[in-house]
Every structure is written in C-alpha cells, then in structure tokens.
Amino acid sequence: MEGAELKKFYETHLESGAGVSVLTADAPNPFGYGRILRDSVGRVTGIVEEKDASEAQRKIHEINTGIYCVEMPLLFTLLENLSNDNAQGEYYLTDILAECLKRGRDVCGIKTQDFDMVMGINSRRQLAQAQRVMNERIVGRLMDEGVTIMDPSTTFVEKGVKVGRDTVLYPFTLLEGETEIGEDCVIGPNVRFTNVTVGHGSSIQFAYAHDCRVGNGVTMGCFNHLRPHTVLSDHVKVGNFVEVKNSTVGEGSKLPHLQYIGDSDIGSGVNMGCGTITVNYDGKEKHRTTIEDNAFVGCNSNLVAPVTVGRGSYVAAGSTITKNVPEDALAVARGKQVNLEGWAKKHREK
C-alpha cells in the first residue's frame, strides 16, 4: 500500500470525527474476507467474519482490509470489552466497531477503489498474486520514467531499485535490493542483480552479480558470476564463463573467457588470456594477486598467490607463476617441449 493512500485514509478519519475508521474495498471474490455491514443509510454497523456470516451476508462484496484508524485511549477501552463468543472461539479485533457504536461514537467506513492495493495474503497463491501486482506497478513506473522493458511480465524489479532513462531491460531480468542501473544500459536477458551498481552505457547479459560495482561502458557476455566486493572499472570487458570475486579490475582491462579471478587487484589495460586463473587459496588462507597496468597474461596460466605481475610484463601461455614478475619482463614457467620423431609410428606398430 502506498504512503499517499494511508495519508488520505488518516486525513479522512480526522475529518469525519469518528471514533474508529476502517478501510474497505469491493472484492471480486470476497470469500475468506470479513464483510462490511451497513445500515439502510450506508453507515457502518459492524464486520462479520466469513465463518460467522449468514448466506445473505456472504453475498456482500465490500470487505474489511484490516486497516483501521482509532483514537488510542478509545482503543484500549474497546479492547477490554471484546468477547470470544463466535464460531472460531477467538477474539476479533473487528468487534471494536460494534463496541464503538455502543458508546455513541461513529464508525467511518472509507472505501478504496483499488482492491489490489489491499488484498489479503493468506496463501502462497495470494502471495504470488500480490507480488505480481506490485511488480506491475514498479515496472510501469520505470517505463513512465523512460526505461524500455521488453516484456514486463517476465521482468522483475524490487521497490528499492533505480534504473536510468533509456536503459533497456530484456526478459528474465531480476533486479533486487539496492541495485542501481545507470542510463543507456542494456541489461538481460537472464540477468540477476542483488545490491549491484552499474554505470552508464553498460551492456550485460546472462549474468548473476551481487554486492558489487560495475562502471561505465562495461560489456559482459554470457554466464558470468560477479561475487561480493568486486569492482569493474570503466570500459572493462568480461567475456563468457568468468567468475570474479573480491577483486578490482582496472579501466579497459579484458577478461575474455573461462577465468576465475579471486582476491585480485588488476590494473588498467590488462589482458587476461583464456583459461587464466588466480590461485588464491592454499588450503588454509586466501592470498591476493596483483597484476599491474598493461600486463599481458597468456592463455591457460596459473598465478599462484601471493604474487605480483609487474607493469607491462608478459606471462607466456601455459605458465604457472609462483614468483613475482618484474616490470616489462617475460615470464615463462612451463616444461620444455621435446619432440621424439618417429615415436608414434613405432607405438602403433607394437
């Protein structure tokens, strides 16, 4: 329920001078709700619960939303006189209306025209229905603010999320928590963000990220996972099948595909070859890897932390690096290739 509606309800209650006000609504299917009882001139005389209602009363569509406004001193007086003489054997808060009338105070029934806003939730079906209604309102507001949502029925956005103008959300995008997306972004399909900040002009698809920051102009391909405390600076490229955890990636650096980057500090202009891994765990503790600006790490390399790859240096493909690499150096850490000519032919002839 929106705060503006509650404020309107409260102000109407004060204007009425009633001892108790109840917010009501017309329900398409009133089954399970308490019914509002009115006299011949439309004044509220009470509320009857489903199990206590007569056949005629069950045909009433005006229902109790469970939202009341009551003077505090009067409320305690009314509560003292409640009885559990009903089919449920329970004390009904709704009985305060009848008690209020007995004391000569008016009861005001204030009807809202928006049943969806006040629907009761007593089952998982009703919970799903309420979530759908709320999501429709949130994505509708975003579209009114200039966000393009390709399919509102398959895009899910929580209330605290912010999305900038001219951003496009593709189907099966789920934005949760305090996520904030900048302007001119393309998000989705199949993206889930929880507490993620994304700058302007970024394009991300098929990804799961939580508790991290993504800069401006970042591109992310398919099947990537950004874990907590990850920071991708502006114009970083993340390809396919990449996991980044508790790491900072500098401006313009590239993580093209098939990589695990954990507990690392990567400078700007760095290229990480396919299959490169930062080996951060020794079985007991996590250690950090540092890769300085403009370094080039070849494919299928293992960087065993703690280790530093110096500025502008190269790591040859297939290397396992266990020692620091100096600035502008080439590090090669792999077995020397040996060709045994004719070996395969002899092996086949055995």
Map each language-model feature to its residues.
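Short, charged, intrinsically disordered terminal tails
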Residues: 340-350
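Generic beta-sheet signal
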Residues: 23-24, 47, 110, 324
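Structural signal for interior beta-strand "rungs" in well-ordered beta-sheet cores
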Residues: 148-332, 337-338
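Short beta-strand-to-turn element immediately C-terminal to the catalytic PLP-Schiff-base lysine
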Residues: 36-39, 69-70, 121-122, 158, ...
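Catalytic-core segments of class I nucleotidyltransferases/pyrophosphorylases
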Residues: 45-135, 140
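Short coil/turn connectors at secondary-structure junctions
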Residues: 15-20, 31-33, 41-44, 64, ...
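Catalytic cores of nucleotide-enabled group-transfer and carboxylate-activating enzymes in metabolic
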Residues: 1, 7, 11, 78-79, ...
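Conserved beta-loop-beta/alpha segment of the NTase-like Rossmann-fold superfamily
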Residues: 1-41, 65, 69, 77-82
